[in-house]
């Protein structure tokens, strides 16, 4: 009974080490806060004019998002497929034998009518076979902010979208680097043109929790389980 109690207590303690997905994801994360246009840093000139060259655009200039705070719409078209297979097979056999001990006169030595001899054998084998197939796809749109313009002109973009539904919340987060040449005239860019892209799509709430295993199941499936 004592061993059962100790095992149960140890299971509860170790289960706390098993992390849950999206437990630290919250809305209004400052990291994904909107970036607003930089303030005008031009020195004020007392000429009586209200014209601001920083916020102005040439009549024939390209209207692409190229400044901090501008908005770019990302066209999500992501698709991945992966497969993996592994097979392992080992076999080992060993035998050891001691013939009957021969005594004086060339006769086997007997103890209690039985001759002295020894024999042992062992046989061990292992077979393992595993296969894994995974495919994912993501399509949709998300508008993000230009957070920074690098010296070479590339744009650091970042943003998120939250959807509050009856059974929970869903969110998309995206960040990466974009070349100005890849931004179209209507300020859109394909997701496969984003360098160092970090795209996260998940959710919180009853629907997401229903797809997650319980803490005890996660413990027995984790590396903490010794068997």
Swiss-Prot record:
Annotated signal sequence is: 1-16
The question of whether Signal is a record keyword is answered with yes
Domain of life, per the record? Bacteria
One Gene Ontology cellular component term attached to this UniProt record is:
cell outer membrane
GO molecular function terms attached to this record: cytoskeletal motor activity
* Keywords for the protein's UniProt record, in alphabetical order: Bacterial flagellum, Cell outer membrane, Lipoprotein, Membrane, Palmitate, Signal
A biological process from GO: bacterial-type flagellum-dependent cell motility
Residues annotated for lipidation of the kind S-diacylglycerol cysteine are 17
Q: State the Pfam families in the record.
A: FlgH (PF02107)
Q: Where is the lipid attached (N-palmitoyl cysteine)?
A: 17
Q: Identify its membrane topology class.
A: Lipid-anchor
Q: Does the keyword Electron transport apply?
A: no
Where in the cell is the protein located? Cell outer membrane; Bacterial flagellum basal body
Functionally, this protein is described as follows: Assembles around the rod to form the L-ring and probably protects the motor/basal body from shearing forces during rotation.
Instruction: State the NCBIfam families in the record.
Output: PRK00249.1-4, PRK12698.1
Query: Can you tell me which family this protein belongs to?
Result: Belongs to the FlgH family.
Q: How does it assemble?
A: The basal body constitutes a major portion of the flagellar organelle and consists of four rings (L,P,S, and M) mounted on a central rod.
Q: What is this protein called?
A: Flagellar L-ring protein
Give me the gene this protein comes from: flgH
């Amino acid at each position: 009974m004592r061993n059962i109690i100790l095992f149960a207590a140890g299971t509860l303690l170790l289960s706390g080490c098993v992390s849950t997905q999206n437990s630290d994801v919250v809305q209004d994360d400052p990291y994904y806060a909107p970036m607003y246009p930089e303030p005008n840093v031009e020195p004020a000139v007392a000429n009586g004019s209200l014209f601001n060259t920083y916020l102005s655009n040439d009549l024939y200039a390209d209207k692409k998002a190229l400044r901090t705070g501008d908005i770019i719409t990302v066209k999500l078209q992501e698709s991945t497929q992966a497969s993996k297979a592994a097979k392992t097979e080992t076999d080992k056999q060993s035998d050891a034998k001691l013939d009957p001990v021969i005594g004086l006169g060339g006769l086997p030595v007997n103890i209690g009518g039985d001759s002295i001899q020894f024999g042992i054998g062992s046989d061990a084998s292992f077979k393992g076979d595993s296969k894994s197939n995974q495919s994912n796809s993501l399509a949709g749109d998300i508008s993000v902010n230009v957070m920074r313009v690098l010296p070479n002109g590339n744009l650091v973009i970042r943003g998120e979208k939250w959807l509050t539904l009856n059974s929970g919340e869903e969110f998309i987060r995206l960040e990466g680097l974009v070349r100005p040449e890849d931004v179209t005239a209507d300020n859109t860019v394909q997701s496969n043109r984003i360098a160092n892209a970090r795209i996260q799509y998940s959710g919180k709430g009853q629907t997401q929790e229903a797809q997650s295993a319980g803490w005890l199941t996660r413990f027995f499936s984790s590396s903490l389980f010794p068997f």
